[in-house]
Curated annotation (Swiss-Prot):
Gene from which the chain derives: fbp
Ligand binding (Mg(2+) 1): E92, D114, L116
GO biological process: fructose 1,6-bisphosphate metabolic process; fructose 6-phosphate metabolic process; fructose metabolic process; gluconeogenesis; sucrose biosynthetic process
Complex formation: Homotetramer.
Protein name: Fructose-1,6-bisphosphatase class 1
Family, similarity comment: Belongs to the FBPase class 1 family.
Binding site for Mg(2+) 2: D114, D117, E281
Annotated catalysed reactions: beta-D-fructose 1,6-bisphosphate + H2O = beta-D-fructose 6-phosphate + phosphate
Keyword field: Carbohydrate metabolism, Cytoplasm, Hydrolase, Magnesium, Metal-binding
Species of provenance: Delftia acidovorans (strain DSM 14801 / SPH-1)
Taxonomic classification: Bacteria, Pseudomonadati, Pseudomonadota, Betaproteobacteria, Burkholderiales
Stored InterPro entries: FBPase_C_dom (IPR044015), FBPase_class-1 (IPR000146), FBPase_N (IPR033391), FBPtase (IPR028343)
Enzyme Commission number(s) from the entry: 3.1.3.11
Length: 335
């Protein structure tokens, strides 16, 4: 791997040498990265910048919005609306789609994002992040409708996340493996630190909110019980449990050293298939994980094959090290 390769140079080389990234997509990804730098600056200021605490409003899901939720959402919209790369955007924080205003040129891409994942951790200074996904606008009709966003995850042309932790790190795929970039604040740009990330097929770490165990379905309970049984149990090895309550942070750990992340269906909301959003969280993370050699399902079906029917559709998520995800999926099929 070459040293000190900036994100811009990396994307240009991907476009020039490999032909993987069309010019407009390259420019779009650079704009998203710049927006993430701005969000990182706001996160870093914390109380000094008066960005902590709640905003006194709720999002479309009925969740209390943090000030930084709104700031991050506005940053992403303002950064991306005028560049000519997009036709429309959709955000976890907005009820409907956001059409690029007519005063700006329109592009061929659709951008979806969770502007600040894990925002319950903002005030306690735990890692949070931005998740994004890019689709191509379907051809054959003028304008953009919500239906244009109803594409399975297999149709993504780019996906990534930016984690705001001890370092600000951008993780990206355009369908040719996963690369990681760390923000060099002195240089002012993201710098390539790892290419072709691979998630180990086996692991001894699982991430799940154990306080909800009584609400889980039998297959998930079975899997976790076997992990807890340790070396004396049917798995024959001891497991560690991790849970940060920030999907970006939990998935980033899996990208770095393996593991399995589970946010399953539970009985408290039996009519909802899960908690996480398919379009803004599950699809981009599932594609990243698969591109790194892992797997991602809802327990029964590959996440990327799910056909969305609504903008804020929810889904159960089981992703990470391939053999462990297959084990949980097997238990669902046997139930």
């Amino acid at each position: 791997m070459k040293k000190n390769v900036s994100l811009t140079r990396y994307l240009v080389e991907q476009q020039r040498v490999d032909g993987l990234i069309p010019g407009q997509l390259r420019l779009l990804l650079e704009v998203v990265a710049r927006a993430c730098k701005r969000i990182s600056q706001s996160v870093n200021k914390g109380a000094i910048g008066d960005v902590l605490g709640t905003a006194g409003s709720e999002n479309v899901q009925g969740e209390v919005q943090k000030k930084l939720d709104i700031i991050a959402n506005e940053v992403l919209i303002e950064a991306n609306e005028w560049g000519g790369h997009l036709a429309a955007m959709a955000s976890e924080e907005m009820e409907g789609i956001y059409l690029v205003p007519n005063r700006y040129p329109h592009g061929e891409y659709l951008l979806m994002f969770d502007p600040l994942d894990g925002s319950s951790n903002i005030d306690v200074n735990v890692s949070i992040g931005t998740i994004f996904s890019v689709l191509k606008k379907p051809e054959g009709h003028p304008g953009v409708t919500e239906q244009d966003f109803m594409q399975p995850g297999t149709q993504q042309v780019a996906a990534g996340y930016c984690i705001y932790g001890p370092q600000t790190t951008l993780v990206l795929t355009v369908g040719d493996g996963v690369s990681m970039f760390t923000l060099d604040r002195e240089q002012g740009s993201f710098v390539l630190v790892q290419e072709n990330i691979r998630i180990p097929e086996d692991t001894k770490e699982f991430a799940i909110n154990m306080s909800n165990m009584r609400h889980w379905d039998t297959p998930v309970k079975r899997y976790v019980d076997e992990c807890l049984a340790g070396v004396e149990g049917p798995r024959g090895k001891d497991f560690n449990m991790r849970w940060i309550a920030s999907m970006v942070a939990d998935v980033h750990r899996i990208m770095t050293r393996g593991g399995i992340f589970m946010y399953p269906w539970d009985r408290r909301e039996p009519n909802k298939p899960g908690k996480l959003r398919l379009m803004y969280e599950a699809n981009p993370m599932a594609w990243l994980v698969e591109q790194a050699g892992g797997a991602a399902t809802n327990g029964k079906q590959r996440i990327l094959d799910i056909q969305p029917t609504q903008l804020h559709e929810r889904v159960s998520v089981i992703l990470g090290s391939k053999n462990e995800v297959e084990k949980v999926t097997q238990y669902h099929s046997e139930a």
